[in-house]
């Protein structure tokens, strides 16, 4: 049956109320092509119906027989209904004032940043800035982040964010293992490091043979460790002078990592000045809500000598084709997509949006504003200390920035009860102690409530705050020897935008430089840049989700946990697995967790020797990097001429490693954009040799509702919630089969446990990036089972339409039976380079002149473009992209035929900035109009790249990763 145009339905009368109720209206907003457009595209492909196309694309042997079993979410909700249902869950959470600390603090998000960054699609729908010319705004904001971190830590260079403080500390451990003394495999963790950090470090250390020791900081120098982790200030609040200890560790041949509070560093001597080699931490308290644990931007800063070993993104300064300053991601050869199992990290997605928020918090407040906030926090902590001492309590720590640990003896339970009555959370620091960590949001009234609680338990009257304040010396709790004297945030960007008008215009100027989904399609293969709907994003900023501490008592987080349970069951239904964990806070972390689960399974069966991971040659670089992190040996399986796993080679290698085979990692549909016909056979071969099947969920957007990895042989997968399930570039996974469910990650340090057999924590918070999980919940609730399947089918339709239209101009490298692809296609530009000298990079840069972000370049095959349009793009937008690609092919043909010079042509000089096109001198043989307006549609809506082509080689040769002086832009 053909799809019927909605106008025909509307003309039928009478219509009932049931027919007029718009429960599935969201699906029509999310799915770009309407019924008429879909039929036109199907006609182009030679299919009568969408169902017929899907039957031809997906192997019948793996098709899902039943509708997605979504239970109460099978029927779609309208946007209003879904928001109301989620609001009901959010209202079950109790927003207490949390003084728990432990790395998480309440904070004020400046409204100008909330509205113009966090809630602005120009910022949250953008992709990783691999195409620098159309990412200058985000790159500048991230460069500000790097400058902020480097200044505050006192170290030479910082990266552009990591996932959370605990994983950043684990990354620092492996960094120091690479550069440290070879005779040691010991990493020493001081006993006042945050407990969740220690647990993540232990998880990371075990599979790679690092021995983690923990004890008093004073014993660190004698531990013969290649690295030592210190907390500054300590978890209990102490501010210790570690200068002599750092010298002793260095003298013993070790290196020092410091986990430092970013706000405290505005008033405390930075770790780089007292001996730290690496600093890590969390920037959450710089304006990013707690969000039940995330997402937040962690940081890492290092001494200059370690910059090429540092994991994560690194923004650097270079010049463009006209010699003007331009920003780009530097030293990319360190990253997993290039170095694979030899990479320094498997970090694929950094916390860019949250890093931008934190950097803008510093820009808005400036050095003086930040110091004022820090001094106010410290003053409130000092007044609290004075008050409780007046009431007869003793503090464990005499020095502190914002945290007190208090001896409360037999009054402890009573104190917690009094606090609960005032809707206050104190840290449970044992049976006879409580902890209190104050923050930017703590007011005089809050301080009065805290003092009243301690007074009640003591049977006394709370002291007067003004009297305490009058009798208190300036900054009595900060050791004078550790007072910060060095300047920070001296660059003009941190000293100019302090009025809201200036800040608003600065943010607008940056977002105008970038190309995000709010301007045009981002057809990146393997990235699924689909709609992040506004109604999905709205709940992220609700205080009932944002102001919840990750270690808040369970009775305060009922709504969160109910929502998470529902989302886990939704994902179980979509994947065909038995259980899902949402703790991993990135796809790469999901991979890593999944492989650790596989290892735990083998270990439970007395087969811990199984450590070989088979990985197809076409795999994404995170696969071998994650396998290496999980302590596995990578054995590459060949692919055949059609891009499929070579079955003969797989059989040979599975047989050769039958005794020690742990797993195979496959992507489905394949990284080549094809539903491999023999995926069941692949799974059966590996299972026959005792291995487990890891199905990379990066391409789940081609499977939802149509097939499921848990049903065709997969044992474990990670899910990229930021791809298939609409979270802006974020994280997800893993899902596992029934025999692996008991091994899903725990977080024992905070009391979160799925079972005694679970692996250790892989993220700092029990539920990872919890505050963005409502996005996926909303998406699934508003789509329902039928429309989720329709979205998958439309993604496949859109990809095949592009492949069909472009095939006469660019060969489609891989396809399945009937010449069909899955949800993405690979265009082969290698013959073009041979015939014209035009490279895939030239085409990518030229697309910017047409107003498009390039498809994925040279992955998985060098010299190709991988195109993934997603279901969210309309036929009109697809046709605009197709027209641009055809026009570019015509420009290439002009070079091939000698009508255009091989060097002086619009592709080689792309992209063209407004400054270049309007300059007095025009040195090119082609016209200004051809440079800037190659198609007529650009006249009405033109995006101008802010810089010319970035010089990558210059940037890496002359590495500079700090803010650029204004004079350089003159």
UniProtKB/Swiss-Prot annotation:
Family membership noted in the UniProt record? Belongs to the GcvP family.
Q: Which reaction does it catalyse?
A: N(6)-[(R)-lipoyl]-L-lysyl-[glycine-cleavage complex H protein] + glycine + H(+) = N(6)-[(R)-S(8)-aminomethyldihydrolipoyl]-L-lysyl-[glycine-cleavage complex H protein] + CO2
GO BP terms in the entry: glycine decarboxylation via glycine cleavage system
Looking up InterPro entries in the UniProt record yields:
GcvP (IPR003437), GDC-P_C (IPR049316), GDC-P_N (IPR049315), GDC_P (IPR020581), PyrdxlP-dep_Trfase (IPR015424), PyrdxlP-dep_Trfase_major (IPR015421), PyrdxlP-dep_Trfase_small (IPR015422)
Q: Which Gene Ontology terms of cellular component type are present? A: cytosol; glycine cleavage complex
This one is known as Glycine dehydrogenase (decarboxylating)
Alphabetically, the GO molecular function entries are:
glycine binding; glycine dehydrogenase (decarboxylating) activity; pyridoxal phosphate binding
At the top level of its lineage, which domain of life is listed? Bacteria
The enzyme class is: oxidoreductase
CDD domains the record matches: GDC-P
Q: One Pfam annotation, family name?
A: GcvP2_C
What biological function has been recorded for the protein in this entry?
The glycine cleavage system catalyzes the degradation of glycine. The P protein binds the alpha-amino group of glycine through its pyridoxal phosphate cofactor; CO(2) is released and the remaining methylamine moiety is then transferred to the lipoamide cofactor of the H protein.
Identify the keywords attached in UniProt to this record, alphabetized: Oxidoreductase, Pyridoxal phosphate
Q: Which residues carry this modification: N6-(pyridoxal phosphate)lysine?
A: 723
Q: What is its EC number?
A: 1.4.4.2
Q: How does it assemble?
A: The glycine cleavage system is composed of four proteins: P, T, L and H.
Q: Which coenzymes or cofactors are required?
A: pyridoxal 5'-phosphate
